[in-house]
Amino acid sequence: MFVKSETLELKEEEEVLMLLGSASPASATLTPMSSSADEEEDEELRRPGSARGQRGAEAEQGVQGSPASGAGGCRPGRLLGLMHECKRRPSRSRAVSRGAKTAETVQRIKKTRRLKANNRERNRMHNLNAALDALREVLPTFPEDAKLTKIETLRFAHNYIWALTETLRLADHCAGAGGLQGALFTEAVLLSPGAALGASGDSPSPPSSWSCTNSPASSSNSTSPYSCTLSPASPGSDVDYWQPPPPEKHRYAPHLPLARDCI
């Protein structure tokens, strides 16, 4: 029984391979290679007196009697394979086209983002330049046609704002002082010694270089927030001028601060 089933299987495989070889030349490569065992079996099947030969002939007649059934059974499988291949090819082409479209989309998005970033940076620089130009218009510059850089403009604006703040605080301090000493001190801070000497004419000495500072960097050991210093090159007579006068000299003078001292 084992020999019969093996022979039938071999014959069926040969018939299937023959049908496939006639259908497509590519299937000819799938034919099995002959061996010595196969040749011996073929010889036994061809002998007319042997039992295996009779059984092989019957099996061969049965297979030849229904060639359409074997071909019909093999053709649907091959057709299915061709259909799968046809389906795979469009899917591959679609994948390639999708990849190309995706790369183009990514490049387009990157270009759009870069253009938007450039526009934002350009607008920011325009706004910054416009703001600095408006700041230069309100800052006092000497000469007026001097062109300041951005850093110089910001530093000068900082110093100018600080000077205005100190001037306002000095005016408040002058308004709060009711004595003649506060008025004279304010006059010493706001007026130059040369202008005061030219107006009074009490001393013929030349004007000295006074410097009154009220900055955060002033020394901490001073009792007053306002510190006035005299340069070494100035004469000593100017120190006597800035000292407050004796009380009997201004006995009948009203002790009121001058209007120019509070400006």
Curated annotation (Swiss-Prot):
Cite the Pfam families for this sequence. HLH
Instruction: Output compositional bias ranges, type Polar residues.
Output: 24-36
SUPFAM superfamilies found in the cross-reference section: HLH, helix-loop-helix DNA-binding domain (SSF47459)
Q: Where is this region: Disordered?
A: 20-76, 197-253
Q: Which GO terms describe its biological process?
A: axon guidance; Cajal-Retzius cell differentiation; cell fate commitment; cell maturation; central nervous system neuron development; dopaminergic neuron differentiation; forebrain development; neurogenesis
Q: Which GO terms describe its cellular component?
A: nucleus
Q: Which Gene3D superfamilies match?
A: Helix-loop-helix DNA-binding domain (4.10.280.10)
Q: What InterPro entries has UniProt attached to this entry?
A: bHLH_dom, bHLH_transcription_factors, HLH_DNA-bd_sf, Ngn-2_bHLH
Q: Name one GO molecular function term.
A: protein dimerization activity
Instruction: Give the main location.
Output: nucleus
Domain bHLH residues, every copy: 112-164
Which keywords does this chain's UniProt record carry? Activator, Developmental protein, Differentiation, DNA-binding, Neurogenesis, Nucleus, Transcription, Transcription regulation
Q: Does the keyword Transcription apply?
A: yes
Q: Where located?
A: Nucleus
- The Low complexity compositionally biased stretches are 197-231
Complexes and interactors: Efficient DNA binding requires dimerization with another bHLH protein.
Q: What does this protein do?
A: Transcriptional regulator. Involved in neuronal differentiation. Activates transcription by binding to the E box (5'-CANNTG-3').
Entry protein name: Neurogenin-2
Q: Which gene encodes it?
A: Neurog2
